[in-house]
Amino acid sequence: MDDVEYRTEFSARERAGGDIEEGLELFGPATFKGMEGDPVQRFYNGIESAGRNLIRDGHIKLNKQEQTRLLSSVLRITYPNYKNPMGTVLGFYVTDGGRGPIDKGRLSHVQSFMEEVTDMDLRDLIRYCRLWLALK
C-alpha cells in the first residue's frame, strides 16, 4: 500500500475564515478575522466596507474625522448582528452622525442611489436615521 502524504491546500485557511492581514486603507489599517470574528468585529468590517464603497463610488462624502466617528460609534450600537451595515452608514450620513435632525437634502440624495447599493426601502433608511438620533 502506498503512503499518501496530505498537505494543506494553498489558501485553504483564508477561504475557511482564517486571519487575513490586510487593510482597506480608507479608514486606516485593519485586521479581518473572517468567520472567526465576533458579531461586533463582523459589523465593524461591514461598516468599513460599506463606507469605502459608498465613498469610492462617489455616492457620499465623509472626511477622516467623520469616518473615525462612524467607526468608533460601532461599539455603542446594540445587537450589531441584527443591523445592516449599509443602512447604518447611510443613516449616519443623513443625520450627520446623529448630531442633527434628518437632513432632507441628504435624504433625497441617498434615495436617488439607494436602489443601486442596497435592497432597503425608505422606511428602513428612516429607522437607521432614528437609530443614530437615539445614540446622541
From Swiss-Prot:
InterPro entries: DUF5770 (IPR043907). Pfam families: DUF5770 (PF19074). This is Uncharacterized protein 045L.
